Curated annotation (Swiss-Prot):
Its EC number is 3.1.26.5. PROSITE patterns: RIBONUCLEASE_P (PS00648). The keyword Nuclease applies. GO terms for cellular component: ribonuclease P complex. It catalyses: Endonucleolytic cleavage of RNA, removing 5'-extranucleotides from tRNA precursor. Keywords: Endonuclease, Hydrolase, Nuclease, RNA-binding, tRNA processing. This is Ribonuclease P protein component. Belongs to the RnpA family. The keyword Hydrolase applies. PANTHER family: RIBONUCLEASE P PROTEIN COMPONENT (PTHR33992:SF1). It comes from the Bacteria.
Length: 125
């Protein structure tokens, strides 16, 4: 489970991230990111916060919950590498229902990398 300080809970936070943030689409998900320091809020401190949107288009409840659990597990590993004060909303597309956890993680990391929220992985030995 994602710790409470790293969860997006309020509808207004989701809306601000989706409407005012940057967006990067991948095959099975769309990543929205918003830097809280840009907002007129005093709540720009704290670690990154993650929110999930898994609609009925993904599939029945069992499948939607499975996709959400996979994405939450991936987000736990990203808490330490995404910059503090960043809100991230991950919107699952219908293809996420059949994608493996590894594919979802690769797509999420690629989206965050394109949004300049992750440092590129060095391939030097």
């Amino acid at each position: 489970m994602l710790p409470e300080p790293h969860r997006l809970r309020r509808h207004s936070d989701f809306s601000m991230t989706v409407r005012r943030g940057r967006r990067m689409g991948r095959r099975d998900l769309v990543v929205h990111a918003f830097d809280r320091a840009q907002a007129d809020e005093l709540v720009s401190s704290g670690g990154p916060r993650f929110g999930l949107v898994v609609s009925k288009a993904v599939g029945p409840a069992v499948i939607r919950h499975r996709v959400a659990r996979r994405l939450r597990h991936i987000c736990i590993d990203l808490v330490d590498v995404v910059p503090r004060g960043t809100d991230v909303v991950i919107r699952a597309l219908p293809g996420a229902a059949t994608a493996s956890s590894r594919d979802l993680e690769k797509q999420l990391r690629a989206g965050l990398l394109r949004l300049d929220l992750l440092a590129p992985v060095s391939t030097s030995a």
